Regions:
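HotDog/MaoC-like acyl-thioester-processing domains
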Residues: 1-27, 106-115, 119-151
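Hot-dog-fold acyl-thioester-processing enzymes
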Residues: 2-100
Length: 151
């Protein structure tokens, strides 16, 4: 997906969530998997527990920061995306875990009141050499705000 106005169409995965298997994932296919609105209360509560930097927990200090106002922790945004992914995209019966993440980038600040649209692109799929009935799906995730900007 490009870095400008990148919100894909509504969830277009042709296979229902409870029927998805390795062969159903098509490299290059992009699917939306949910929306979330971010509130000031959520930003502050998450940050107090996990990322207590002033621009996440103190609106006044945040106004004086380079961000010019309160912003969500990137870890909060990533966590919320993961929740949407689990609830709306992966098949809980066939998913076998993840070998890890290669890269995370937070491109624009997420602010109170933003509505984020989450999407996933199947970048590649690699059959297991030792277990031919399973494989690894490489994906790119992202989210756009209500302006269509990648965050």
């Amino acid at each position: 997906m490009s870095a400008t106005n990148s919100t894909p169409p509504a969830n277009t995965f042709p296979t229902p969530i409870n029927d998805r298997y390795f062969e159903d994932y098509v490299p290059g296919a992009v699917h939306r998997f949910g929306e979330m609105r971010v509130t000031e209360q959520e930003i502050v509560e998450f940050a107090r527990l996990y990322d207590p930097q002033s621009f996440h927990v103190d609106a006044e200090a945040a106004r004086a920061s380079l961000f010019g106002g309160l912003i969500a922790s990137g870890w909060q945004v990533t966590s919320k995306l993961m929740r949407l992914f689990v609830d709306n995209y992966i098949d809980k019966r066939t998913a076998l875990g993840s070998p890890g993440l290669d890269e995370i980038r937070w491109l624009k600040p997420v602010r109170p009141g933003d509505t984020l649209t989450a999407w996933v692109e199947c970048a590649a799929k690699v059959p297991s050499k030792s277990k031919p009935d399973i494989g690894v799906i490489h994906e790119h995730w992202g989210a756009t705000n209500q302006k269509g900007e990648l965050v």
